[in-house]
Amino acid sequence: MDLIAFCTKNPALMLPFMDRLTPYGQYWFVTITPYGRDIEPNVPDMGTVMDNFKILSDIVGVDSIGWRYDPILVDAAHTVEWHISEFEKMAATLRGYTETCVISFIDIYKKVERNLPEAKAVSRGDKFTIGKVLIEIAAKYGMTVRPCAEGNNLAAYGVDIGAYDTCGHLCKYCYANADVNLVK
């Protein structure tokens, strides 16, 4: 085995076990977004996750951890300007703890329509504006923005991860949970 890849919104759960993982190559993707409990009901608050991100980065190294700002949804409460402002604050906080930020925009799947009916696809113009500005902000803080590999089925390469109806965070934008009762 060359590498274990981790994707999480809550790295705190793994911190007590890091000594067991040190013999292995690792790469961590930690999703941190500024949404509140109305969108991400069971995700720890952003400040706590950023603190744990820093601890994890100190353990694995800046080149073995990436920040996911994902998904980007634009609506009346989460405007383009709001995302730019929040991203700037977050990038400043994470400066020196990662060199990579992966972004993606919300995908409107049927499960997303059911859980977040007000969600709309982000317009091409808003995607361009957000992408351009986030790239500039990230560069200012020593990070490179990369897009998520959306639309590519990479399962044949061992990249497809996760299982449906298993995540207890219950984010409104998530396509992986069809039935909340199955998760519980």
Named regions from a protein language model:
Residues 1-119, 123-126, 130-134:
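Conserved AdoMet/S-adenosylmethionine-binding subsite of the radical SAM
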Residues 108-110, 140, 163:
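Electropositive, surface-exposed helix/loop patches at the edges of structured domains
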Residues 114, 125-154:
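A C-terminal junction/extension of Radical SAM enzymes
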Residues 150-164, 184:
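N-terminal [4Fe-4S]-dependent radical SAM core
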Residues 162-178:
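Local cysteine-cluster metal-coordination motifs and their immediate loop/turn environment
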